[in-house]
Amino acid sequence: MTRAGRRLAVAAGLALAAFIAGFVVFAVAVARLAPAGSVRADGIVVLTGGEHRLSVAAALLSDKRGKRLLISGANPIATRHDLFQRSGLSADLFKCCVDVGYDAHDTSGNASETKAWASANHFSRLIIVTSSYHMPRSLTEFGRAMPEVSLVPYPVLPRRSQNWWADAIKARVIFSEYVKFLPSAVRFAAARLTGLDEGAVAGGNEMRASTVRGAR
């Protein structure tokens, strides 16, 4: 093997080792995430998905941890009544204080949808509710879209989150999320270094507040 070939092999090996080490750090970190006990904010945002996210966010609203709740990225076939039944909230509280966004199809879309909602309601501090493994990428996308808004993570923990290495399905989910998180983190860092936020980068694609359906 030539000297250049050896250098390339060493560089590739170091890159692979760094990638694997990064995954282990990421997996351990998300397994240790825990929701804050007495968190409060202007609004609450839940990113639709499994792990009882909606019921957790609804409990925060019921406990008056925020003024309004946005359900971001709701399935188009899910009606407000469907979401109401799943939330466990009273009819009056759901009617007055829950908004439903149907336009987000990924985490970046969640960030855009939330930015429009927060702006329309003049909110500067938000509680973000999503699964623990999805939280790092959510915070980077939301932070890039709304650098002026304070984000409070409220992770929903999966069962046996500490034993992710013993569950092939869970480990695969965390690995997939890690792979998605890396480019998101790079975009976040680049936006910070260049002084650009999501609105400046993709202002023409920003979702309007009117796309979020509320009771008002």
Predicted segments, located by residue:
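N-terminal type II signal-anchor transmembrane helix
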Residues: 2-35
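Short, intrinsically disordered low-complexity segments
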Residues: 2-6, 124, 212-215
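Generic intrinsically disordered, low-complexity segments enriched for polar/acidic and small residues
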Residues: 16, 20-23, 130, 175-178
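Short linear elements at protein peripheries
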Residues: 191-216
